[in-house]
Regions:
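Active-site/substrate-binding loop(s) of hydrolase catalytic cores
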Residues: 1-97
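Generic structural signal for well-ordered, non-membrane alpha-helical segments
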Residues: 45, 93, 97, 101, ...
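Alpha-helical packing segments of well-folded alpha/beta enzyme cores
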Residues: 48, 52, 100, 172-179
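Active-site-adjacent substrate-binding region
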Residues: 51-72, 95-121, 126, 133
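Hard-cation-handling environments
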Residues: 110-218
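Short, composition-biased local secondary-structure segments
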Residues: 19-28, 72-76, 101, 191-207
């Protein structure tokens, strides 16, 4: 946002070669110390992560979506994720990703909106914004909309369409409501499986931690 305020025109220029669409390194992804906070979930080396996860633990959500943006030439991405999945991810966590993904797809299909799933974004590394919730019993997912720091207010894509900030907001809003709807429709099962997750792992947590000592969930 600060970069666009400094470089954007009063009338948005959709040409991707213009200054307002060419944010310099390191962009807006990192914190002040150039640390990628979307790789810090399990390690919690940064203050921002520590405070965010303190709040997370106060709520312990059953379903958690990590909203992102990607290249402005990409269609929308939502769950389910691509393999590999870590073997500690439960069958229910896999199943409900598909339930939510199918509901998102229904809404996108009705509006003839482009999207993809099962092709990118794994669930193996434990410190992402979607995998940290998964290793804490939730249904964790990443949603990615085209745009990012290069999107500005409006930009022409490689398909010669014009992608606007308004469109980006609307698509995230749409998947948000679709996710809430799918969760509501399966609320009893969501609650039961969340409880089952912790009942199971409180019994054999030490065994699992010893077997998978390459990372720890704090």
């Amino acid at each position: 946002a600060n970069f666009y305020r400094m470089t954007g025109n009063l009338i948005p220029d959709i040409d991707p070669k213009t200054r307002e669409h060419r944010e310099p390194w390191p962009g807006g992804r990192t914190n002040h110390y150039y640390h990628d906070l979307n790789r810090d979930g399990s390690w919690q080396t940064q203050k921002e992560t520590q405070y965010r996860l303190k709040l997370y633990k106060e709520w312990m959500p059953h379903v958690h979506v990590d909203y992102h943006e990607q290249s402005y030439n990409e269609p929308y991405y939502f769950a389910p994720a691509v393999e590999p999945y870590h073997e500690l991810i439960t069958p229910w966590q896999r199943e409900f990703q598909n339930i939510i993904g199918n509901n998102n797809a229904d809404y996108f299909d009705k509006r003839q909106l482009l999207y993809f799933r099962n092709e990118d974004f794994d669930l193996l590394y434990p410190a992402y914004g979607d995998t940290y919730p998964i290793y804490n019993g939730a249904i964790g997912m990443t949603y990615e909309k085209a745009g990012g720091g290069s999107g500005g207010v409006a930009v022409k894509t490689s398909a010669t369409d014009t992608l606007t900030l308004k469109e980006r907001l609307e698509h995230h809003y749409l998947t948000g409501l679709a996710t809430v709807e799918a969760t509501y429709q399966n609320s009893e099962r969501v609650i039961q499986e969340f409880q089952k997750y912790f009942k199971k792992y409180e019994k054999d947590f030490l065994t699992i931690a010893k077997a998978y000592d390459t990372f720890s969930v704090i």
